[in-house]
Amino acid sequence: VQMKGITKVYPNGVAANQGVDFFLRRGEIHALMGENGAGKSTLMKMLFGLEQPTSGEIWVNGEKLSLTSPTVAISHGIGMVHQHFMLVPSLTVAENMVLGMAPRKGLFIDHAKAVAITKEYAEKYNLHVEPEAKVMDIPVGMKQKVEILKALVRGAKILILDEPTAVLTTQETVELFKELRNLKEQGYTIVFISHKLNEIMEITDRLTIMRG
C-alpha cells in the first residue's frame, strides 16, 4: 500500500491530514502512532473507503484506486476493525459473520451453513468464538475476534485495527497479540493504530508517527 500526498479538509475548513505519505509492506505489522487529533483514524478511514481524500493518491498492489466506499475497499482485500464494534447485538456470532453475504434458504439465513463457515474460519485462524452465542452475551475480547473473522471471511489481506487494545483486559491483549502474530505468519498485513508505546514495541515491525 502506498498513500501519497494525502490531504483531507472537511467542509468547515478543518484539515485532518495534510500531505501525508504512508507506505505499508506486505506481511508486516505496522504501527500508526500519534496523539489524539493527529489524523491516524482519518487516514485509515480513507484507506477503508469510509472517507475520501481531498487530494492525493492511494495505490494497492501497484494499482491506483479510488476507494469510494468500504465495499470497494473490501473488494481490494482491505478490512477494518473499528474501536467501537459494528456488530448486531441481538444476532448470533454466526449471523453477524455472514451479514450482508448470508447463505440463504429462501428468505431466511441458512443458519447451519453460517455456523459451518464460522467454525471453519475460527479453526483456520485459531480465533476461538462461539458461533451460536448471541453477540450481546459474549465478552469484549470475543466480539473483537468476531470482527477480525468478519473481515477475513470477506477476503481481507490487509487488516486495519483501530486502537484494538483500548477495550481489552491484559489477558485479552496477550491473546490478541498471539493472534496477530499468527496472521502475520500466514502472510497478512496489519495496521495497528495505537498510542501505547509499550504495545507498539512488542508487536510491530515498523512504526509511522503522525503529528497533530
Stretch-by-stretch model annotation:
Residues 1-212:
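Glycine-rich phosphate-binding loops of nucleotide-dependent enzymes
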